[in-house]
């Protein structure tokens, strides 16, 4: 009988400790004063040629608030009209998702990673063009935060099946033609 009482007390103590140690990490704030922090305010990609993808750049989105923050949506402001491709915490902002993701949760003290690359469209100009868009984070509190995405793009003329000839007046010639 004493063993049963001892086991019962041990079970009660263990259960009590487990219940008391539970942390409420599932609470989310709707306060407009709780906002996200970003590793950069502008994500600049390398200068690129039109129709040639840039290397992927990344940024971090931090939640330094005392509670979790839920983003109602994360989207490209232009709806991907400029050629940016974005992945937010593993979700690609593609055509099937309407170039946005919804209900992104960032727990208190946690962060998510955003991956960005660009394949700019042909601009039909001789000068470099600034390609820009904004990544919009709409928080559950109604606060909207933006991160600017930009890169310069040059139109290039790609010469295929051409060789540079040495000592010939014609600089470019067709191979075997």
Task: Identify the residue ranges that each predicted region occupies.
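Surface-exposed binding patches on compact interaction domains or structured appendages
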Residues: 23-44, 54, 64-122
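Intrinsic-disorder/low-complexity, polar/charged segments enriched in Ser/Thr/Lys/Arg/Asp/Glu/Gln
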Residues: 54-58, 111-113, 144-148
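Low-complexity, Pro/Ser/Thr- and charge-rich linker/hinge segments at domain boundaries
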Residues: 147-175
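Hydrophobic beta-strand positions in extracellular immunoglobulin-like domains
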Residues: 60-61, 118, 137
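Bacterial N-terminal signal peptides that target proteins for export
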Residues: 1-11
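C-terminal motif of bacterial Sec signal peptides marking the signal peptidase cleavage site
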Residues: 18-21
């Amino acid at each position: 009988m004493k063993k049963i009482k001892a086991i019962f007390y041990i079970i009660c103590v263990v259960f009590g400790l487990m219940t008391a140690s539970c942390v409420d990490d599932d609470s989310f704030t709707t306060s407009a004063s709780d906002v996200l922090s970003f590793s950069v305010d502008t994500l600049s990609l390398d200068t690129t040629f039109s129709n040639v993808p840039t290397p992927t750049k990344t940024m971090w989105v931090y939640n330094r608030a005392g509670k979790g923050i839920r983003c109602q949506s994360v989207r490209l402001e232009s709806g991907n009209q400029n050629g940016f491709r974005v992945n937010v915490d593993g979700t690609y902002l593609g055509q099937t998702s309407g170039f946005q993701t919804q209900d992104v949760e960032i727990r208190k003290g946690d962060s998510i990673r955003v991956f960005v690359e660009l394949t700019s469209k042909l601009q039909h100009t001789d000068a470099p063009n600034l390609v820009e868009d904004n990544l919009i984070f709409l928080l559950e509190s109604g606060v909207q935060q933006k991160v600017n995405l930009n890169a310069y793009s040059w139109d290039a003329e790609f010469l295929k099946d051409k060789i540079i000839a040495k000592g010939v007046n014609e600089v470019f010639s067709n191979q075997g033609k």
